[in-house]
A protein has these predicted regions:
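N-terminal intrinsically disordered, cationic/polar leader segments
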Residues: 1-120, 127-173
Length: 173
């Protein structure tokens, strides 16, 4: 799960980059949607995924491009299928400008991309899913807000995870 991945990020390494960047541009660079005839009516069980993140650094231009990829698989509840009834995926390119790159390592950029890159792209992913479900003619899905929790916060770990994405969609276990 995405929250588990975030717990392995060295936030201190990400902060060093975060203090020096400004988000300059966000673009969708790759997307796909698939709708089966069975997928037009909910409610749905939904699985959200975040794939690997590509990080590109241009030292001359002092830019950092973070490319997070997200996907969603939706299964009509009680349809008993192994494959999703509809799928949505997108890769975003987040371009950041940097004040300077002094003393920044590849580990700093990786940590930043996996923490801030996902966090900054998440609202665009939410809007993309909302828009695509409307265009596909299925009940719109509202992706939950992205919450960062401290990696060693025992109190936060005790809180129950929200299982509902919205009234017409459930998060698949």
């Amino acid at each position: 799960e995405l929250q588990d991945k975030l717990k392995t990020i060295d936030i201190e390494k990400a902060v060093v980059v975060a203090e020096r960047v400004a988000l300059h541009n966000v673009r969708v660079v790759k997307s796909s949607c698939l709708l089966k005839p069975s997928g037009t009516k909910g409610p749905y069980e939904v699985t959200l995924n975040q794939q690997e993140i590509d990080i590109q650094i241009n030292k001359e231009k002092k830019t950092l491009v973070v490319l997070p990829s997200f996907s969603l698989n939706a299964f009509v509840i009680d349809n008993k299928k192994d494959s999703p009834d509809f799928e949505i995926s997108a890769t975003f390119a987040l371009t950041y400008t940097l004040e300077d790159l002094d003393d920044l390592s590849a580990e700093n950029f990786q940590a930043f991309g996996h923490a801030n890159g996902i966090y900054n792209a998440w609202p665009y992913w939410r809007e993309f899913v909302q828009s695509m479900t409307a265009r596909m003619g299925v009940p719109p899905l509202t992706i939950p807000v992205f919450r960062l929790s401290p990696p060693n916060n025992k109190e936060a770990e005790k809180l129950p995870a929200k299982k509902r994405v919205n009234k017409s969609a459930k998060k698949k276990k």
